[in-house]
Amino acid sequence: MEFTDFSKTSFYYPSSQSVWDFGDLAAAERHSLGFMELLSSQQHQDFATVSPHSFLLQTSQPQTQTQPSAKLSSSIIQAPPSEQLVTSKVESLCSDHLLINPPATPNSSSISSASSEALNEEKPKTEDNEEEGGEDQQEKSHTKKQLKAKKNNQKRQREARVAFMTKSEVDHLEDGYRWRKYGQKAVKNSPFPRSYYRCTTASCNVKKRVERSFRDPSTVVTTYEGQHTHISPLTSRPISTGGFFGSSGAASSLGNGCFGFPIDGSTLISPQFQQLVQYHHQQQQQELMSCFGGVNEYLNSHANEYGDDNRVKKSRVLVKDNGLLQDVVPSHMLKEE
């Protein structure tokens, strides 16, 4: 072997591995290294394996070095045609495969199935929520109806009302109780308003409505609602015998002054108060009549025994069944008055 051949082989092919073998190794490691990195690593390996003797030959023969280096660089840059065909075919196959079967994301089928299952689960949940909402609305409507029914029952369970019609020029008539006005309302088809009163006693819930009749303006309609739970403050005053015990009974004494207080001619007592006074007067009359009627019967039954006794005659004259309270009071007391 000549020196020139040895130098070429030692310089251009420093190791037992050829350039093509290195190219196959580079193709195997293509996924980890790029083309420029392979080029730099090839040059670095060439310079690392060059011996000092070949380096001296390279410096002494610059002309012979330039041509093989150009060939080497071109051979490294240009890959063999077989590898280019393989890579092109692989790329075409990959592209065709990607077009036919697009790349599936990891767990795409599981995600799609999970999403469908989630939708299927959400549907019954929404239906359950709608059913619960409907049940809540039904319960609310039922409770509202019950409350309305209770309110209606409470309204229906109001106390009885009693109305009195009195001819008077004064709207608010005295009836023995104290009232406080708490409202006034216009009446339909009537020019006269309706006044509302409440009893001033705290424990009493009696109400009174006063309005003037539009058919007969001289008539006042007084409506009472409820019953008083206390005695009238006017009846608690001392009773005057002169005003209560008159010649024509309690009904005639109402205009002269009943229960110890004077009543003007323009002021009228309500029928409710009049009925109360008449009821008590009738009870007292019945008790007195039963008492003195028994005395009269006793005298009549024993008249034959006593004969024409003057004392019996006098007693008969004194005891007269007039049906009035004058029978109790002696005649001389009445004359003195």
Curated annotation (Swiss-Prot):
Subcellular compartments: Nucleus
Primary localisation category: nucleus
Keywords: DNA-binding, Nucleus, Transcription, Transcription regulation
Database matches in Gene3D superfamilies: WRKY domain
One Pfam family matching this protein: WRKY
Compositional bias ranges of the Basic residues kind: 142-155
GO biological process, one term: protein localization involved in auxin polar transport
Positions with biased composition (Low complexity): 106-118
Coiled-coil region: none
Family of this protein: Belongs to the WRKY group II-c family.
Listed name of the protein: WRKY transcription factor 23
